[in-house]
Amino acid sequence: MSGTRAYNILVLPGDGIGPEVMAEAIKVLRTFNSSSMQFHLQEELIGGISIDTHGHSVTQPVKDAAVAADAVLFAAVGGSKVDHIRRGLDGPEGGLLQVRKAMDIYANLRPCSVDVPSREIARDFSPFRQEVIEGVDFVVVRENCGGAYFGKKVEEENYAMDEWGYSTTEIQRIARLAAELALRHDPPWPVISLDKANVLASSRLWRRVVENTISVEYPQVKLVHQLADSASLIMATDPRVLNGVILADNTFGDMLSDQAGSLIGTLGVLPSASLDGLPHPGKQEKVRGLYEPTHGSAPTIAGKNIANPTAMILCVSLMFRYSFNMENEARQIEDAVRAVLDRGLRTPDLGGNSSTQEFGDAVVAALQGKY
């Protein structure tokens, strides 16, 4: 069809509640199909279900499909019968690590704002006093392809070791992305870089390269170096101090982004994006990305139609924003989710009695102006 923009998306539902929440995200995505925009979906196996079917947490054809796709939607893995005997890259979670590595999506972004998905959710579920979390607005930018998670490993009966290495090139590219993201705000957000330069050699290199890269190439961006453990304390006591772009390596970024979920009160509503760059504002271009909720596979509630699809639906919003440079559509989804939550339609984890499908249907109705 002439003038139709086509987007090829790889869909990886995975294990546990993954297929259920993914179905609702796809339902939302399909509402944007039109004469000018079409989404072509390819669904494949990953995680425990892939091990059960193929003997591997992810197959080479799936990794190839991820590299070829314009974007990847991933739900959850784990909770399978092989979890206790298959670990690392051989286990269910290893499939996701392999896909990230194959795609070279080196930057993981986890936004944290009291306004997304809903101020009402933060008010009702955050364990923090409202005056502590009021105004919290930051994004954790985590290096996604290096560090301890991908380094050499030794695991013996009485000794184990994880190599925690980084190169200058790996640090430079994530520092540049963090600075570019900071510049998208007016005035520019600060970049708060986390490390343990007082004890770790890799962190000393991290601090030096981040300093040299941002101070020279992005002088208009304020750069703050913060020890990671100190940042964790700040996040628990005065989180607005961290407003801006929090830049961290794979390990510290993983920890701090999960802690950020406690400010909102639940990981069940928070999406994340893993990218190989950022789109240029105002241009019709595609950036390779993988989008996943921050929650797990929740096998104890799988198949019961009670899982919360909010985070998975918001992954579609992030995909529109970062892979397809479609800010208006991204905001439409966020506004629709907020409208549904603020009117009290919630799944059991948020104190409601709505089903997974009912929540997805309500978001679609809100997008269509019928809610």
Swiss-Prot record:
InterPro entries found in the cross-reference section: IsoCit/isopropylmalate_DH_CS, IsoPropMal-DH-like_dom, Isopropylmalate_DH
The keyword Transmembrane appears for this protein: no
Cofactor: Mg(2+); Mn(2+)
GO terms of molecular function: 3-isopropylmalate dehydrogenase activity; magnesium ion binding; NAD binding
Compartments where found: Cytoplasm
Known EC number: 1.1.1.85
Cofactor: how bound: Binds 1 Mg(2+) or Mn(2+) ion per subunit.
Positions contributing to Mg(2+) binding: 229, 254, 258
Keywords for this protein: Amino-acid biosynthesis, Branched-chain amino acid biosynthesis, Cytoplasm, Leucine biosynthesis, Magnesium, Manganese, Metal-binding, NAD, Oxidoreductase
Residues the record lists as binding NAD(+): 79-93, 296-308
Positions marked as site (Important for catalysis): 149, 196
Reactions the enzyme catalyzes: (2R,3S)-3-isopropylmalate + NAD(+) = 4-methyl-2-oxopentanoate + CO2 + NADH
GO biological process: L-leucine biosynthetic process
CC annotations in GO: cytosol
Entry keyword annotation includes Transferase: no
Biological function: Catalyzes the oxidation of 3-carboxy-2-hydroxy-4-methylpentanoate (3-isopropylmalate) to 3-carboxy-4-methyl-2-oxopentanoate. The product decarboxylates to 4-methyl-2 oxopentanoate.
Subunit structure: Homodimer.
Recorded family membership: Belongs to the isocitrate and isopropylmalate dehydrogenases family.
Name by which UniProt lists this protein: 3-isopropylmalate dehydrogenase B
Source organism of the structure: Aspergillus niger
